[in-house]
């Protein structure tokens, strides 16, 4: 069936190859240096180089210079590990929005957590629905929001998937699809077994057991 593309939530870049390091891990390592009072400019610039290569490869006109200045400043001010981990999603969302010509919505302005660290579903749904009603198309980073203390907070594992479902609910989407870099479910871990066969039909119960 045909699909209309309205709201897009975006994950950050992963590994470019099996020997590569994920951006999240690079950000964690960089923040650890900042938290310990060590020099972190060089590893931070390595992260920027990865994003610059994406910008150049796609022929985008956007620049992330100011964003990285802000990240550096916030790292020095100990913005927190959640803030560090979320920056990959944030930066990639900016690039995707520029590439698609969509509006960029920072998740920290529309996804809220309460004082206990749980999703404030009612506030999030209300604010997000209003924001989405004001724009035709938007890119929203997954994985994070803002805590009651005003600091960036991340969801637990699978947070990008959760963000997608939150956005789908807020805009009353008739269909929400979660795409990954693997085509379906496989009978074995492809990192261990070469060319494992796909599972064509599987129940939710069976999937949960996997």
Please provide the spans of the model-predicted regions.
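Nucleotide/pyrophosphate-binding catalytic subdomain
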Residues: 7-210
């Amino acid at each position: 069936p045909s699909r209309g593309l309205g709201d897009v939530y975006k994950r950050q870049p992963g590994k470019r190859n099996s020997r590569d390091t994920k951006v999240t891990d690079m950000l964690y390592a960089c923040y650890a240096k900042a938290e310990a009072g060590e020099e972190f400019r060089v590893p931070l610039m390595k992260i920027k180089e990865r994003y610059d290569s994406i910008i150049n490869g796609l022929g985008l006109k956007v620049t992330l210079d100011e964003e990285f200045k802000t990240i550096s400043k916030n790292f020095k001010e100990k913005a927190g590990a959640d803030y560090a981990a979320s920056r990959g999603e944030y930066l990639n969302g900016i690039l995707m929005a520029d590439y698609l010509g969509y509006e960029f919505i920072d998740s920290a302005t529309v996804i809220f957590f309460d004082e206990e660290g749980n999703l404030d579903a009612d506030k999030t749904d209300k604010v997000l629905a209003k924001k989405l009603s004001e724009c035709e198309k938007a890119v929203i980073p997954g994985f994070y929001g803002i805590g009651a203390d005003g600091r960036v907070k991340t969801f637990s594992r699978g947070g990008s998937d959760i963000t997608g479902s939150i956005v789908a609910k807020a805009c009353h989407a008739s269909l929400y699809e979660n795409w990954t870099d693997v085509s379906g479910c496989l009978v074995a871990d492809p990192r261990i077994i070469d060319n494992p066969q796909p599972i064509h039909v599987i129940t939710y119960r069976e999937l949960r057991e996997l």
